[in-house]
Amino acid sequence: MERNLSTVKTLVQFITESQKHVFGASGDLSKILNDIAVAAKIINREVNKAGLLDILGMEGGMNVQNEEVKKLDVYANDQFISALRSGGQCCAIASEENTDIIPIENNGHSKSNYVVLIDPLDGSSNIDVNVAIGSIFSIYRRVSESGPGETVDCMQVGNKQVAAGYIIYGSSTMMVYTTGDGVNGFTLDPSIGEFCLSHPNLKIPEDGFIYSVNEGNYADFPREIQEYIYYCKTPDFETSRPYSSRYIGSMVADFHRNLIKGGIFMYPATAKYPLGKLRLMYECNPLAFIVEQAGGKAIDGEGRILDIEPTNIHQRTGIIIGSKNMVEKVEAFIQMNVGLNVYRLK
């Protein structure tokens, strides 16, 4: 059945209406969100026809994480950088694919007030097998005075974010974001080329029945995570256990499913990665901001993700994120094992 387009609220309309309720809003943040959406549409087009183009596979280089760079990673990175450069509201960009921040000299803009941190293509190891992948972004207000952005602008604690979101490229393409006033999801309607409000005021269920973790690393997990996984697998009628194990290997896809249905995603520190593996600034912080705005929790095993003081743009951390009661159950196991975990080196 065709929808009545007069009842559809596009992302542009939603952002414009929301801006009206913010005293003194300049519109700069709204423009950045729109620029990100434009880049996402272009990336979505290439993702959808990637199997028909010479854009799959390896690009040949290594990124700052010592991971092989895939062609679509490079393409996505270029699109976000181009969109944010041309917009004029962004003074610096930090990306998973770039060792250093990218300062932006905006001629004609006396003061560009924001910095954007991005993971251009999360889950890119799944590109070749047609599994859902995504992009993650985090936005901060600059702390330096003016001119091109500096490292200090990008190295802010997560609770200072002014906006964060992700785009998931799957059976449909969605953009989910927060500006600190709830979480809203928009689905790309290819017939009109616009993101349309499809999931207003998203809330993650307080309880869930899905746990997402790479159990291939079980032997390297801290004791409390091993015990929690055992708890998830143990039958119990009152708590509807055993829970379902669902792990895609794309953080955005796993997180998105758990946000909608309720669940927990875990990528803890391990013996091999004692400081964690996922990146704090452009993976964990933005998703932590979103989940808290949706009523969930995000911790690193010792405290709140959004309270971690960054020391490096590409800093890694463990993360446990999802439904409030499920994360708090992990915290209970952590408390029972205080002093016993040989892997916690922070």
Swiss-Prot record:
Subcellular location as annotated: Cytoplasm
Alphabetical list of CDD domains matching this protein: FBPase (cd00354)
SUPFAM superfamilies: Carbohydrate phosphatase
The keyword Metal-binding appears for this protein: yes
Swiss-Prot/TrEMBL catalytic activity: beta-D-fructose 1,6-bisphosphate + H2O = beta-D-fructose 6-phosphate + phosphate
Enzyme Commission number(s): 3.1.3.11
Keywords tagged on the record: Carbohydrate metabolism, Cytoplasm, Hydrolase, Magnesium, Metal-binding
Residues binding Mg(2+) 1: E96, D119, L121
Cofactor binding annotation: Binds 2 magnesium ions per subunit.
GO CC entries: cytosol
GO molecular function: fructose 1,6-bisphosphate 1-phosphatase activity; magnesium ion binding
Cofactor: Mg(2+)
InterPro entries for this protein: FBPase_C_dom, FBPase_class-1, FBPase_N, FBPtase
Top-level taxon: Bacteria
Subunit annotation: Homotetramer.
Family of the protein in this entry: Belongs to the FBPase class 1 family.
Listed name of the protein: Fructose-1,6-bisphosphatase class 1
Species in which this protein is naturally found: Cytophaga hutchinsonii (strain ATCC 33406 / DSM 1761 / CIP 103989 / NBRC 15051 / NCIMB 9469 / D465)
Gene that this polypeptide is encoded by: fbp
